[in-house]
Amino acid sequence: MTAYDPDNIFAKILRREIPSHTVFEDETALAFMDIMPVVDGHCLVIPKVAARNIFDVEPEDLAALVKTAQRVSKAACRAFQADGHTLRLHSETSGGQEVFHIHFHVLPMKTGVPLRPRVMGDHAMLARHAAMIREAF
């Protein structure tokens, strides 16, 4: 398996080298808006530890990440009045992973509303959505 790359985009976001629309942060994790959202409120939850995928992360770090993903999911669903949600974790290219730093996709879902194609989101909209989720905690 390929080693963790400390220059991946999420590592750069953690180091504040690249801006993001932050939803939540604590000592173990960071949640921010996906820049190519497939639904309103689509955000990502990443650990602050360097781990390529689920096979590389320590169990206690994974547990903390899942706890944060649950909190963010609840807030995102409240913010967007979702009647369901999807929580995704992809590992490696064949599993759909595109950024090789373990992360969960949080997708607040509404019945009858399909996923959109992955296209760059408007930054003003992403900032508004991040604020809506932060207010829902």
Regions found by a protein language model. Give the residues of each.
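HIT superfamily nucleotide-processing domains
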Residues: M1-F137
